[in-house]
A protein has these predicted regions:
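GH16 jelly-roll
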Residues: 1-245
Length: 245
C-alpha cells in the first residue's frame, strides 16, 4: 500500500473559519437526540483563534433553548472515501457536555451510515466512545456497534482522535480502526464480502462534523454548575487531517 500521504488538512490558522472547507450549521431542533443546545454562528460560540478552532458552550436563553453551542461540517465541500482521518482535540469538561468528531455519508440516516470517530460525555469523564451506525444496526434501534475505552484524564490535555478506514484489508473485507494518539484501540470489520449498503455502507464519500452538544440521549443530565467556573466550557481543535494511500 505504501505510505499514507496527507491529502487535506485544516490547521485553523488565522482569525476565521475557512469557508472553502466548512459549513456552519444553525438550529435547535434536538438533532434527533433530544439535545438541548441551539447551534449558532456567533463568535461567542464559534471562532478561530490562537491556532485553534474554539467551540464554546454557553448557558443562555436563545431561540427557545437554554444553551448555545456550535457545529460545523465539510458537507459538499470536502469528503473522503477511505483513509486515515485525525483531529487533535482538547475536550470540554463538565457533566452533560457531548463533544463529537464524526463523519456522515450522503442521503438519509441511518442508510447513509455514520462513523463516530470520537464522542465523549462529561458525565463519564474518562470514557471515549467509538461507534458505527448502519441501516440494520443503529442508535435508534439500540443495536449499533460501539466501543468505549477508558483513558484516565482524557479531558486534561490535547489528544489525537482518529480512524483508519481501510479498503480490502483482510479476507477481501474493509475494516475501520479507531485510534487515540495513534494507538489502535478498537476495530470493526465488514461483516462479509457481500456489498450490502444496509449493513456496511462505508464505501462511498463521507464528510466530517465537529460539534459540542448538550444533554440529550447520550449527554445525560446537565450540571449547570460548570458554567459558574472560571474555565469556559469549550472544545479546542488544533487541526484536522486526512491521509490516503
Amino acid at each position: 500500500r505504501g505510505e499514507y500521504k496527507l491529502v487535506w488538512s485544516d490547521d485553523f490558522e488565522g482569525t476565521s473559519l475557512n469557508a472553502d472547507n466548512w459549513n456552519i450549521e444553525i438550529g435547535g431542533g434536538g438533532w434527533g437526540n433530544q439535545e438541548l443546545q441551539y447551534y449558532t454562528s456567533r463568535e461567542e460560540n464559534l471562532k478561530v483563534a490562537d491556532g485553534n478552532l474554539i467551540i464554546t458552550v454557553k448557558k443562555e436563553a436563545y431561540e427557545n433553548r437554554n444553551y448555545t453551542s456550535a457545529r460545523i461540517t465539510t458537507k459538499n465541500k470536502r469528503d473522503f472515501t477511505y483513509g486515515k482521518m485525525e483531529a487533535r482535540i482538547k475536550l470540554p469538561k463538565g457533566g452533560d457536555t457531548w463533544p463529537a468528531f464524526w463523519m456522515l455519508g450522503y442521503g438519509s440516516w441511518p442508510y447513509c451510515g455514520e462513523i463516530d470517530i470520537m464522542e465523549h460525555v462529561g458525565n463519564n469523564p474518562n470514557m471515549t466512545s467509538f461507534a458505527l451506525h448502519t441501516s440494520t444496526a443503529n442508535g435508534s434501534k439500540g443495536n449499533n456497534w460501539h466501543s468505549q475505552p477508558t483513558t484516565e484524564g482524557i479531558e486534561n490535555d490535547f489528544h489525537i482522535f482518529g480512524v483508519e478506514w481501510i479498503c480490502n484489508d483482510q479476507f477481501g473485507r474493509d475494516i475501520i480502526y479507531f485510534t487515540i494518539d495513534g494507538e489502535r484501540l478498537a476495530s470493526k470489520m465488514q461483516p462479509n464480502n457481500i456489498v450490502d449498503k444496509r449493513n456496511w455502507p462505508f464505501f462511498s464519500p463521507y464528510y466530517i462534523i465537529l460539534n459540542v452538544a448538550m444533554g440529550g440521549t447520550m449527554g445525560g443530565k446537565i450540571n449547570d454548575a460548570i458554567f459558574e467556573q472560571a474555565e469556559p466550557v469549550q472544545m479546542l481543535v488544533d487541526w484536522v487531517r486526512v491521509y490516503q494511500y
